Regions:
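Terminal-region recognition feature
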Residues: 1-175
């Protein structure tokens, strides 16, 4: 215990912590300002101080792009993941397992159908939070599936790809 606490006893003690949502405040990576969550929502995740564009999650992007209640996700086929049995400090299979658990999806791609201002479209979104937005063979296959769905339904395809490059763990197969 600190010597100051021995001399001056605290007068107010709280027994329980208040539960606060984690998205109330967010720090701007551009200028370091603390930004209020509702203000960020209004400004489409652009910092009012420096103009920095903050990252959108897949869920936030869907919410901003599509008419409410129109999104229907199309399940993607499961592909063999570790073609090369790649291993550095961790095996690729372990890295994938962690990413899948953290993001709740099999790979960094989301494909589905929705509407923008009443107009139907096929949407293909890459998830930057899944292994830093790296492309894999599953990402390539998902993109092809999105194009096929768009063609079959005779509707536009919108591809949103905040990517960082190919996954080295899959080599040339990641394209």
């Amino acid at each position: 215990m600190s010597w100051l606490k021995n001399i001056i006893r605290p007068k107010i003690a709280t027994k329980t912590k208040r539960d606060m949502p984690s998205n109330i405040w967010e720090k701007c990576p551009g200028c370091g300002d603390m930004l209020y969550g509702k203000d960020l929502e209004i400004s489409a995740r652009v910092c009012n101080g420096c103009g920095h564009h903050l990252k959108f999650s897949v869920e936030q992007r869907l919410e901003h792009l599509l008419d409410e209640g129109t999104w229907s996700e199309v399940e993607q086929p499961h592909l063999k993941a570790d073609h090369l049995k790649f291993k550095d400090r961790k095996s690729y299979s372990d890295r994938l397992r962690v990413a899948r658990r953290d993001r709740g999806r099999r790979d960094g791609i989301v494909v589905g159908n929705g509407k923008i201002e009443g107009y139907p479209l096929t949407l293909c979104l890459m998830d930057f939070d899944f292994m830093a937005g790296s492309t894999s063979s599953a990402t390539g296959k998902g993109t092809l599936n999105a194009a096929a769905i768009s063609y079959e339904k005779k509707q536009p395809l919108l591809l949103v790809a905040p990517l960082s490059g190919a996954r080295m763990q899959e080599g040339i197969l990641s394209h």
